[in-house]
């Protein structure tokens, strides 16, 4: 009950700035809390809740158990362990969307626990080649992407604009795009977005709005003022990666996971 009240209070604080955000019915908030507290979650993932604030983040995005939800690049399934059972258990539909080779982590979840994840669907994202099965256009109520935009900007063939166009296409009119991403100061050199793992809020907003999205609001639930964003190996210097190994491990562990933007967009009706 205490955690549920804290979640409601957090959502209320967010709503001061963004009235359309976080308005989950009491029953949905309860189901979300149950998904977060599920004993089926990996203990190492549970330990990171203090950095990632999954209940408050999903409430801010307004994810309901009856929704059709697409998670872009779910990776090893950190959020999938919460959002997939929450949605599938409430009569909704859950898609894990990524290139086929990047869906191995999610498929492992399905193999280990088919009761929880067996009804989930997979789709190719971004769908580029003929015959690739992406999420059908106009299907999703909510599209979620956590810590992925920086990858779409980096490398020899960046595809951020394509990714945002396809996310826009898969949403229903009125559908929500929720983004969590490592946050680069607006005063930083733009070139750092290509190597540090951090991205400017203005860059994410530009990409979304170019694709047709309308910005709804932001939350500071995933902010971390201890993150100075000036590390030798970029954001991967911090937990959970700690790419420098034991070198200054205590220092970087004390900082915690990165400072992150949490942004909500809507596909206009």
Where is each model-derived feature located?
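Class I SAM-dependent methyltransferase Rossmann-like catalytic core
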Residues: 32-60, 64-65
């Amino acid at each position: 009950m205490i955690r549920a009240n804290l979640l409601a209070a957090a959502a209320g604080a967010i709503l001061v700035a963004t009235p359309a955000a976080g308005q989950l019915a009491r029953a949905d908030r309860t189901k979300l809390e149950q998904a977060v507290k599920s004993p089926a979650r990996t203990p190492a993932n549970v330990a990171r809740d203090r950095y990632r604030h999954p209940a408050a983040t999903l409430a801010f995005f307004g994810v309901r158990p009856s929704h059709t939800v697409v998670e872009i690049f779910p990776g090893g399934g950190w959020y999938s362990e919460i959002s997939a059972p929450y949605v599938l258990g409430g009569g909704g539909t859950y898609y894990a969307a990524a290139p086929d080779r990047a869906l191995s982590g999610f498929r492992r979840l399905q193999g280990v626990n088919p009761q929880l994840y067996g009804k989930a669907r997979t789709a190719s994202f971004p769908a580029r080649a003929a015959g690739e099965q992406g999420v059908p256009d106009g299907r999703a109520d909510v599209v979620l992407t956590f810590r992925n935009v920086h990858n779409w900007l980096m490398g020899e063939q960046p595809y951020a604009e394509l990714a945002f166009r396809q996310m826009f296409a898969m949403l229903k009119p009125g559908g929500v795009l929720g983004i969590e991403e490592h946050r680069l100061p607006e005063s930083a050199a733009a070139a750092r977005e290509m190597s540090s793992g951090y991205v400017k809020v203005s860059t994410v907003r530009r990409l979304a709005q170019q694709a047709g999205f309308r910005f709804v609001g932001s939350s500071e639930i995933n902010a971390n003022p201890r993150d100075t964003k000036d590390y030798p190996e970029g954001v991967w210097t911090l937990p959970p990666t700690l790419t420098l190994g034991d070198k200054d491990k205590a220092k970087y562990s004390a900082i915690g996971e990165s400072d992150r933007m949490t942004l909500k967009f809507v596909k206009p009706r």
